[in-house]
């Protein structure tokens, strides 16, 4: 997005983009679809008749169509007035298609779509329907199956696994290794997956799955949102590097695991599976305990639950740190054994 914000409640998700000149547009995400938006204009087609009329699935600044017309931004050849257009090409009028986009933005959208709709289109090879540098990648698609928290985490952590662009490739043609910006990158700081659960009591509906540090090497942990305080392991992050902090522990793990990727990958994958499994199991147990005997002070109960989740995350993260440190130490360049002499 250029300046994009997602809004959601139990019933709807809307995506709003600022399109410059103090104007905005918003589009309702179809109930059965997902959206991919790298750091560029995302919305592809826009129904101005709906936005300026009923506003069922599209909304915008009252004068946006006038702004587009007056500044000659409509690049369509059909001669339809923007205010009457039902499939206005937003990207052509207001988006970017730069060389930087083609190494920084469109490849990430391409990979997410490729993961979630692997057989809908041809994504690779000379006959591909879409490539990493395509400017017409869909803004939203209906996935081939329901999307899980793990699916979202995977695409937000991805680095072109299974393609020639994977920066960790060691075999085959390496000429394209690392040529595109990954989604899981060294400077990831924070990722949150918001889950709203309409089947739960109001106080338990909101869950935020949180991970910190480089997404390639971290894992999301579920936390209830109706709480009084955040566990210190997550909350008290300062500039001082310490393993007392979930953030810094993840940063240390990533720095070592990246440099020693083949030796450390199995440790990271086992950690991710163990922490994800524990998160689901603990969330289920806490939900069931509440439903069996609803607490008068739900916030206090959920705050205590979050502390247990943080404690579990710390235990598993400390264990990962120990294993990654050992594996990285064994590959230090100053290693030497008597048998080497």
Task: Outline where the language-model segments fall.
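C-terminus-biased signal that marks the final domain/tail of proteins
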Residues: 2-13, 22-341
């Amino acid at each position: 997005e250029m300046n994009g914000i997602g809004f959601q409640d139990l019933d709807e998700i809307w995506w709003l983009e600022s399109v410059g000149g103090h104007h905005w547009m918003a589009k309702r995400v179809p109930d059965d679809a997902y959206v991919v938006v790298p750091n560029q204009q995302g919305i592809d087609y826009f129904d101005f008749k709906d936005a300026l009329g009923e506003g069922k699935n599209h909304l915008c600044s009252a004068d946006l169509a006038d702004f587009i017309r007056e500044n000659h931004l409509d690049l369509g050849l059909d001669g339809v007035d923007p205010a009457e257009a039902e499939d206005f090409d937003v990207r052509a009028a207001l988006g970017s298609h730069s060389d930087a986009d083609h190494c920084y933005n469109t490849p990430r959208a391409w990979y997410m779509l490729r993961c979630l709709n692997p057989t809908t289109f041809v994504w690779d090879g000379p006959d591909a329907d879409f490539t990493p540098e395509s400017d017409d990648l869909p803004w939203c698609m209906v996935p081939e199956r329901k999307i899980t928290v793990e699916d979202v985490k995977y695409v937000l952590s991805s680095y072109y696994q299974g393609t020639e662009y994977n920066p960790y490739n060691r075999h085959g043609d390496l000429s394209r290794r690392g040529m595109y910006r990954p989604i899981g990158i060294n400077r990831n700081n924070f990722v949150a997956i918001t889950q709203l659960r309409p089947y739960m009591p109001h106080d338990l509906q909101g869950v935020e799955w949180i991970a910190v540090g480089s997404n390639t090497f971290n894992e999301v942990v579920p936390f209830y949102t109706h709480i009084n305080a955040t566990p210190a392991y997550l909350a008290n992050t300062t500039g001082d590097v310490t393993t007392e902090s979930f953030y810094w522990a993840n940063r240390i793990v990533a720095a070592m695991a990246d440099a020693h990727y083949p030796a450390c990958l199995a440790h990271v994958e086992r950690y991710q599976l163990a922490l994800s499994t524990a998160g689901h199991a603990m969330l289920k147990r806490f939900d069931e305990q509440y439903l069996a005997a609803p607490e008068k002070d739900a916030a206090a109960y959920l705050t205590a639950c979050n502390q247990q989740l943080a404690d579990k995350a710390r235990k598993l993260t400390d264990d990962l740190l120990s294993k990654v440190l050992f594996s990285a130490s064994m590959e230090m360049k100053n290693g030497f054994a008597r048998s080497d002499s």
